């Protein structure tokens, strides 16, 4: 196997947090210690300061580079049997056999636009097959006209052909992040690295980028099958959750300096660490450099649909995204990024809508989400991959959220920390409540593996006309945990969920206690839906599961802090199914409820447990 040396610029992006991410100044007043109400007002003033930074739009030279001038040809489409959701078969549209590949034409148009000093690469109306990634360059806006539908190839090999790093049999790969761990992997469908002043835009929601995540490949599997756990049909050939014989039999084969105790901790008691989804984080724990974490061909880690790394002044606007193989949008270590009026329509596994990671100064405005996982999930590194620092200074406003695991979610990959996040004027519409409900609306999740800090999170003016899931989805604690099995619905059923014991059985290394504090929620109004038992809004109003000290398996005792300093004010949570026990609390301190109505009863109290 051969691999080129990562150039100094990219090495620095992989190893060191950028100054822009490290800074906290966003042009808004600092928080003043003049009482809780004043502090919250100051926080929202800070949020407005973030929004104000996006008043001046990005500017691109007024010249177009139409992809048809570089040889692109539209294609016809046919309907085939495929997945319309993770476990639901149906008819899906795909390019007809013999369709022309537009990869080279789009790449040539972007290169010409960049060489001219920037402008707009225009994808006109029509259906376009692209057998490879669209790679953005500085000062280039890739724009989809009204009625433009870009179908990215569903053949994984097409995303292991054009990367910068020749990894032999694994393909030509790119620097990527997969579930918050750095690696060399298949290219995302839309990709940029270290660029500035870039945009992906559409005329309206008939401007579509399509990842074809549910369209079968030549061997009968689709991208979504790589997740594993198929409920129906033949077993997939391979998946991220199955032991991969291409991975070493001992982590010491790639990290020979590890002690016996370190090896035992990382590998655990079985060979599950050799599945691709566990092998990559194990490489991080072992300190293996990103340049040696080689995946791509022979592995089963699906690429994100849109991934930008180390970019600044980024605009995503006005298009629809369908059927992503994995996370839909994943900016990493980016600054001053805006996503506006984008429709995210992807019901596959891990189809998070928007996952900003280790980013600074982000605005999410006027977007609509219908996702197979979290609608928004803010990330900040995992295991030892925290070099880019926290995600901070994020405003989410005027959005609509339908199906998904969580609406506005922080975590679970948050080892680098998350702070100064503001969500306001959100409608958790949950339109599909009867068949595909939103599991939980406001969600924070971490565990003893992720660790990190989560603080200064503010939510206000939220409506939920159809509540959230009425059924709890219980989690599996570690054997021997003080949390009894099948007892805590931390994955679904609560309107507000703070889960510090998220999926504890998935991680062998649990040595980083999380810190969750200073959470302020106000103006949440939850509606009821009509059931056979009467009007209901959720299973429970609140679920606050603090860190479970039993889970910690580090060398020495660590300070395990409770969830603390949470205020919930002027909220009406409707009528929970479990109105007799409207909240679950474990290891929490100073949770203050003020004018909080649950099942018609007003609560003014401070809770600890």
Residue ranges and their predicted role:
Residues 61, 75, 82-83, 103, ...:
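Asp-box/BNR beta-propeller blade signature and adjacent active/binding-site loops
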Residues 126-128, 139-141, 147, 155, ...:
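An acidic- and aromatic-residue-enriched active-site/binding cleft used to recognize and process polar
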Residues 146-147, 196-207, 312-322, 335-346, ...:
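Right-handed parallel beta-helix
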Residues 302, 310, 333, 350, ...:
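Exposed loop/turn and edge beta-strand positions of beta-sandwich/beta-sheet ligand-binding modules
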Residues 433-609:
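Extracellular beta-rich repeat passengers
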């Amino acid at each position: 196997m051969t691999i080129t040396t990562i150039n100094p610029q990219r090495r620095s992006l992989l190893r060191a947090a950028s100054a822009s991410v490290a800074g906290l100044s966003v042009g808004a007043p600092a928080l003043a210690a003049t009482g809780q109400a004043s502090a919250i007002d100051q926080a929202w003033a800070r949020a407005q300061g973030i929004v104000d930074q996006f008043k001046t739009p990005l500017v691109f030279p007024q010249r177009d580079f139409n992809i048809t001038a570089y040889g692109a040809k539209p294609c016809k489409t046919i309907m085939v049997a495929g997945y319309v959701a993770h476990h639901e078969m149906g008819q899906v549209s795909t390019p007809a056999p013999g369709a022309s590949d537009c990869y080279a034409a789009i790449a040539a148009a972007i290169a010409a636009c960049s060489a001219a000093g920037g402008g707009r690469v225009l994808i006109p109306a029509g259906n376009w097959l692209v057998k490879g990634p669209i790679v953005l360059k500085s000062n280039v806006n890739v724009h989809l006209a009204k009625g433009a539908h870009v179908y990215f190839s569903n053949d994984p090999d097409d995303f292991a052909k054009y990367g910068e790093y020749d990894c032999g049999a694994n393909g030509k790969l790119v620097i990527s992040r997969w579930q918050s761990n750095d690696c060399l992997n298949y290219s995302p469908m839309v990709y940029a690295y270290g660029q500035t002043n870039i945009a992906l835009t559409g005329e309206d929601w008939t401007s579509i980028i399509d990842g074809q995540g549910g369209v079968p490949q030549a061997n009968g599997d689709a991208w979504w099958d790589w997740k594993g756990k198929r409920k129906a049909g033949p077993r997939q050939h391979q998946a991220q959750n199955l032991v991969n014989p291409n991975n070493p039999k001992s982590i010491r084969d790639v990290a020979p300096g590890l002690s016996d105790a370190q090896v035992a901790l990382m590998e655990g008691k079985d060979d599950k660490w050799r599945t691709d989804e566990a092998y990559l984080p194990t490489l991080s724990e072992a300190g293996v450099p990103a340049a040696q974490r080689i995946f791509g061909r022979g592995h089963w880690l699906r690429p994100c649909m849109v991934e930008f790394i180390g970019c600044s002044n980024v605009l995503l606007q006005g298009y629809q995204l369908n059927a992503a193989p994995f996370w839909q949008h994943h900016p990493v270590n980016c600054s001053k990024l805006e996503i506006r009026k984008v429709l995210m329509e992807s019901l596959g596994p891990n189809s998070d809508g928007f996952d900003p990671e280790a980013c600074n100064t982000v605005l999410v405005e006027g977007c609509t989400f219908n996702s197979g996982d979290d609608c928004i999930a803010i990330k900040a590194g995992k295991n030892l991959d925290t070099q880019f620092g926290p995600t901070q200074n994020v405003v989410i406003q005027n959005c609509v959220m339908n199906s998904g695991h969580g609406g506005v979610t922080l975590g679970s990959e948050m080892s680098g920390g998350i702070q100064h996040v503001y969500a306001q004027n959100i409608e958790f519409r949950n339109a599909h409540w009867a068949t595909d409900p939103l599991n939980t609306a406001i969600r924070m999740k971490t565990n003893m593996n992720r660790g990190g800090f989560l603080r200064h999170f503010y939510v206000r003016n939220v409506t939920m006309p159809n509540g959230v899931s009425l059924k709890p989805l219980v989690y599996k604690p570690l054997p021997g945990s003080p949390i009894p099995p099948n007892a805590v619905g931390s994955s679904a059923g609560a309107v507000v969920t703070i889960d510090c014991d998220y999926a504890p059985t998935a991680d062998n290394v649990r040595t980083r206690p999380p810190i969750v504090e200073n959470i302020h929620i106000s103006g949440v109004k939850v509606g009821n839906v009509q059931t056979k038992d009467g009007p209901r809004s959720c299973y429970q109003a609140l679920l606050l599961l603090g860190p479970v000290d039993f889970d910690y398996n580090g060398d020495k005792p660590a300070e395990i802090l409770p969830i603390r300093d949470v205020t919930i004010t002027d909220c009406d949570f409707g009528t929970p199914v479990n109105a007799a026990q409207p909240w679950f609390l474990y290891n929490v301190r100073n949770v203050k409820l003020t004018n909080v109505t649950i099942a018609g009863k007003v609560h003014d109290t401070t809770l600890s447990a």
